[in-house]
């Protein structure tokens, strides 16, 4: 048996295509394609179990509000599992960390209620740091401190 599990990683799901977004219909087609190939989505917590068959993982970085708007209903309706990694200091705010990027587009981050809806749908969340700081610029002690703050 092949123990490799594909991970489909996304940032933003939208009705427009831009630097870190994918159109929601393209996202739906990716997930449906994996299903047609015989794959079933799992969460990271499922990795502790004995995994049988073809599995894949769906992740979303940054917890953009459009993920709750487009992906959540689709995932919930089709009983797919997924994990959203949240920049905890930005809940209900905007993606300030990208503002120096030349293609910057201001995007709203999920609210606490949207995150609760995500969890109540049986989907997982994880930490994507406290404030999206570039961890390469930090020493080991500072990385650990910031990681603890984000949980």
Predicted regions and their residues:
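N-terminal anchoring/stem segment of glycosyltransferases
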Residues: 1-12, 24-30
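C-terminal domain-boundary segment and adjacent tail
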Residues: 22-52
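Metal-dependent polysaccharide deacetylase catalytic core of the NodB/CE4 family, i.e.
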Residues: 5-14, 53-56, 76-151
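Extended catalytic core of nucleotide-activated donor transferases of GT-like folds
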Residues: 42-45, 59, 63-72
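Alpha-helical elements of Rossmann-like donor-binding domains used by nucleotide-donor carbohydrate transfer enzymes
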Residues: 26-29, 70, 149
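Short, solvent-exposed loop/turn elements at domain surfaces
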Residues: 15-19
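Residues within well-ordered alpha-helices
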Residues: 30, 71, 111-114
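A short, Lys/Arg-enriched amphipathic alpha-helix followed by its capping loop at the start of a domain
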Residues: 29-38, 74-79, 121
């Amino acid at each position: 048996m092949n123990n490799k599990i594909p991970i489909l990683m996304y940032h933003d799901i939208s009705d427009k295509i831009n630097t870190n977004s994918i159109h929601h219909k393209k996202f739906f087609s990716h997930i449906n394609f994996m299903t047609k190939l015989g794959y079933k989505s799992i969460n990271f917590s499922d990795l502790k179990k004995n995994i049988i068959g073809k599995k894949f993982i769906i992740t979303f970085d940054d917890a953009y509000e459009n993920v709750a708007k487009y992906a959540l209903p689709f995932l919930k309706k089709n009983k797919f599992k997924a994990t959203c990694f949240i920049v905890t200091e930005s809940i209900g705010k905007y993606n300030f960390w990208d503002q120096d990027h030349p293609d910057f587009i201001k995007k709203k981050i999920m609210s606490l209620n949207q995150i609760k809806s995500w969890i109540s749908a049986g989907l997982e969340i994880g930490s994507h740091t406290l404030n999206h700081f570039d961890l390469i610029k930090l020493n080991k002690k500072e990385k650990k401190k910031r990681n603890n703050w984000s949980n």
